[in-house]
Structures are given as structure tokens and as C-alpha cells.
Amino acid sequence: MTIAALSSLPSYDGAELVIPAPGAGPGNWAGAASAVLVDGVFWLTWRNRRPLSDGRGVTVSVARSTDGVRFETVTEVHRDQFGCESLERPVLVPLPEGGWRLYLSCATWDSKHWWVDSLTADTVPGLPEGNRQVIHPGSDAVAVKDPVIAVDPVTQTWQMWLCCHPLTEPGHEDRMTTRYLTSTDGLEWHDGGEVLAGRPGRWDARGARVTTVVSRDPLVILYDGRADAESNWYETTGVARWDGSRLVADAEAAPVTSPHSDGAFRYASAVPLPDGGTRYYVEAAREDGAHDLITLVR
């Protein structure tokens, strides 16, 4: 059995709408979400994105729910707070010592550069006024964004899978790989090197971005990939397993796609449930070309 045969993998079948796109048509996206279940409450954070001409990723919202489908917005962060052109994938993490941290992906104005920032506060409503700290500044050579962050339940080591875009070749900044980092506090990180990249000639040739952890033993992840530059923003979902030194994509599995418009099925976030199932949140294309945030249980 390949890892693609895992019964917990998501698909578009049976999905429910959680957050609709902020408008109709291409470029309007609700998604790039991450979610966590804490004391019976689902906490969800996502970016609200409009077309390039209307501001791109203007806000990040944080909401709560007791059923995982119907959410009440608790707070919101605006791009102006960070002086950035756009916001992309956020991550909300409950801190082991108490309190919350919101990680944000921020785009530098008039460039292809991205960095990862953060806000830390005692409560979720207090996050917009929380303590700000840059987590990873990126560089002139590399843009960094869309972190996946977890705390290992055994070692208590913080883990990050970070999407990296090389900026050294103009016109090719959409290429992406994933690096693995560790930390003792979630603020200062050690870079463990590249762990996932696209495969020449395959559906993920242009890049591979880890999106969520499906299981830990063995380590199985979902990732976004695409074949070419023209598919930028329309990634689809694949699966990979840790082989002891890096993540290896399932060689037999086709990517999971939306049946609508550009086919995007990306930024999956997996939430383990008490009954052994998994609730997924995914950004998926709809018929008019917009992207909704959907959820499903496997």
C-alpha cells in the first residue's frame, strides 16, 4: 500500500463551506488557513485576499468554533500594521507556557521578497496589540513564507517547515522548496536544511511546499506543488513521507485537485480529532475562479 492509500487523505468529495471568498471571480481567495483544536474549541486563522488591483492579501482573520464548521471571528490583523504589501499564510499556536502566538507571512512592497513575522499575546483577542518579533527576515537571495509550525509532543522541540523562493533569477521567483527548522522557544530558529523539492518532469516540477503534518510515526505530510510558472497560485496537493533524511513524494499518487475552474486544492491544514479522524481545512477553487475555504473529515 502506498502512502497515498491512507484513508485520512483529503479530497473535494463531501466538503463543506467554511469561509467564502471575499468576492466573485479569479483572485478572490479565502484560505491559506491553519487550524488547531484546543480544549474542544477549533481555532482557525486565514488570509483574505483580493485581486492584485484590489490590494492582494489585506487582512488575516482568527475565529473560533465548537463544531469545526461554523466560526465566529474573534480578531483580525491588517497588513498596514506590518508595513507590507500583502499577507499570506498565518499560523496560530497555543504556547506551552500559556498565551498565543500568531505567525504571519509578509510581502515586501514592490518586490518578490517575503518574510515571517509574529505577534504574541496572553489572549487571542489581544494578538493585534501583542508583542511583535520578526521570525525569519529572508534575504536578498531568498523569500520565506507560509510556515507550518508544530511542537513535538515527545521532545517539546518546536518544528517549522518553511517555504523558500529563490530570488536570484528574475522572472523565476515562483519556484519553491521547503526547509526544516527547529527551535526551543518558537522565536529563534536553527535551519536544518532543505527537505522537500519538486521533481523534474512531474506534476510538482516547479516547486513543493509543505502544508500540514498528517501523521508523526511515520512522518507523513501533505504538500502543495505545481508543474510550471503558469500554475502559480493554482497549486494542488500531494503526499510525502520522511525517509530518515528528507521528505520523499509518493511516486504513484496523482495530486488532489478541485473539480472547478483552475483546479486549485492547496494550503491543507490537518486537525486530529479525539475519535481518531482528521478534520481538514483546504483552500479550493470554485466554479467562478474564486477560492473558498472548505472543510472535510476523513
Please name every model-derived segment:
Residues M1-E85, V93-R206, V214-G263, P272-R298:
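Beta-rich carbohydrate-recognition and catalytic domains
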Residues E88:
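A basic- and aromatic-enriched beta-loop-alpha substructure that forms the phosphate/nucleotide-
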Residues R209:
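Predominantly extracellular/luminal carbohydrate-interaction, adhesion, and secreted-enzyme modules
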Residues R266-A268:
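Short glycine-rich, acidic/polar surface loops and turns
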